[in-house]
Amino acid sequence: MNCYASHNYRDFSHAGNISKNFNEHIMQDMGFKNVALRQTHFHNKILGFFATLAGVCVIPFRLHKGDRLVLQYPIKKYYTFICKMAHIRGAKVITLIHDLGCCRRKKLTPQKEMKRLGNSDALIVHNNNMKRWIEEHGYKGGIAVHKMTDYTADAEAAVHKYDVGKCKILYAGALSRKKNAFLYELANSSLNYDIELYGRGFDASQIKSKNVHYHGFMSDTQLISENNCTFGLVWDGNSIDACEGAYGSYLKLNNPIKTSLYIRCHLPVIVWEQAAIAEVVKEKGIGVCVASLQDIDKIVAEITPEEYDKLEKNVIEWSKELKHGNCTRNAINQCLEYLK
């Protein structure tokens, strides 16, 4: 039996929860069975804790020899326990990685993180950069590359028309100064394009530029169906000249889910040239890679309607893959093949 373990999700405004929920639906469609308790949505932390704990406790009793269990990582507190119990029951474990704590929040050392992940028989990683990092840190099991996070939201993108010299760039996600200080630098810059900000945590009183507009939080489905932007920006950190700091440098390993959201919006993306996701952006022809945000002025000035139409056509084709969950399906099937 192929199976997965659901748990409590407090809300779906957090990128990690959105992605995990999409993956659960993809696995259900692939015929996977949930061996934990049903998915719950308790906002109360105590209720959520006990709902997840109860689900973890039933997992060992529902596993059998030869089963393949997919876990979405990180799992607070229970990951190692679930892996060990699965192996005792004769099951194999596939771990689908969403975040590496040792590289993002630095709460774990690489050694501790790899010790945990060493309990898994196979891993699904974001990209080739993360695959190399995992291998260099000693992992010996099978590894499949996710390529890009699927985004299966049931929404249809708005129709976009490219007007020369009238570029609107969408930036959606966490907007706090701690994670994205670069936004405050943009908010005080003279720009030849508009920046449309969607999300929580931005101090709009700091906006001095007439080209930066803060819209607050909007649901992903509404953003997909209603935005009228030209590009989606994938950038983190404290500088407009490079993705720096803990969050910025993490882009060298991480595939931000906002990239997939922009693709579902039918927006070509602008990404940092050193970001791991740049490999897929170039391969699929779905955007442009820049060294600095100061390069955007040149892009806006030089891109032709024909060039934009070609990017958008590629984006629309790739959007179909993400909506149907094909990246996740392919990666899981690779791991299942490895575990035969």
Task: Spell out what each predicted region is.
Residues A51, L100-K115, T152:
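Nucleotide-sugar donor phosphate/pyrophosphate-binding loop at the beta->alpha transition
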Residues T152-S225:
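Conserved catalytic-core segment of nucleotide-activated headgroup transferases in glycan assembly
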Residues R105-L108, G118-I143:
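A short, active-site helix/loop in glycosyltransferases that binds the activated sugar's phosphate group
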Residues K147, H160, A291-K298, T304-K340:
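A charged, aromatic-enriched C-terminal amphipathic alpha-helix characteristic of glycosyltransferases
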Residues K76, N129-K131, V269, A276-I277, ...:
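Alpha-helix capping/helix-boundary segments
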Residues M1-G90, W272-I277:
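N-terminal pre-catalytic "stem/leader" segment of glycosyltransferase-like enzymes
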Residues I224-C265, V271-Q274, A278-E279:
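Nucleotide-sugar-dependent
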